[in-house]
Amino acid sequence: MNKDNTPFDRSALASYFLEFLVIGHRGAAGLAPENTLPSFRKALDMGCQGVELDVHAVNDASGEQQLVVIHDDTVDRTTNGRGPVSLHTIEQIAELDAGDGNRIPRLAEVTALAAGYIADTQPLINIELKGKGTAAPTARFLRTHPGLAVLVSSFNHEELAAFRETDKTTPVAPLFERARGNMLETATQLGASCINMSTRMAKPSLIEQCREAGMPVLVYTVNQLHETQRLKAMGVAGVFTDRPDNLIPVIAR
């Protein structure tokens, strides 16, 4: 954590862009069950400067909202359970097997893991707002966990705007899978610190346009070294990867 617990803001994030970033996608999703503590630990142990995760909000037995780390709207694909995430309580979520005997972690467990790493720079945590209504509980969580190095992103730009209304400081990034409106205008309206986009969108002309506007670009999901090197030469700020083992040994040289 930041030694003085100062808020992590746009200027703090900018220091991460001084080097090319390799961010573990759902941890190291190609090497361990996605969005589990062993997956995040593996990504950080391999040298990723950060990890990306997805959050949904569920209720506990008292009706309080809790943030859990899972990608899909249902638990079907990644666990031994069935049904929408939102219809499970935190207690029911804790009973599910998310692969190799691992549980679906709470957000607090992942941030504690990342904050506990001894490194020159604490790992960046990219929290993607996945479920509807995740903006408010995520903002509350960050208020009670100061000093974390966090970037908040979402494909749901309305949810991201709701987060920005509540939290004016934490860096945000709109996510784009395909061209949709004016990306730079959207980013500016959100007060974004960077743009996260798919590999198919990452064309030289668009990357240059973003760079000229002072908007760093992070690209997902990149698992091959040659593609990473191509994007790095193009000027992107970093990539999200399921396979840090393919990238870190060369990129980190």
Task: Please provide the spans of the model-predicted regions.
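Phosphate-group recognition and catalysis centered on beta-loop-alpha active-site segments
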Residues: M1-R253
